[in-house]
């Protein structure tokens, strides 16, 4: 597995885009996508020779990231690419990680499977199944 992106919760996705551009030189890589399952808006930012940043804004109070945004936002997860998401989940569970979200279609990844796990260091981990369509998006 390799790191794909860092997920950061923001109060306003538009303000977040502007902040990351002004302060760190990141450019908007994708359109803003609404993830109806997680009740969030997401956008990917990129900078040459740097890790991708995914900004995450809750769309309502029932979003899993709403409380983080309400407190000002912050680091939410590290995302890793994997080739066989179910096998990787099984392996990580044997190492003590706990599944938070079972594999489901990820709207920001052309509905290729994603899953969230929680490690014993209290850090959310997102797994991205690197199917054919996902590779096209991830490698841009």
Language-model features: where?
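A short, polar/proline- and glycine-enriched secondary-structure boundary/capping micro-motif
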Residues: 23, 64-68, 136-140
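A cross-kingdom feature marking solvent-exposed beta-strand/loop segments within repeated
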Residues: 29, 62-68, 76, 95, ...
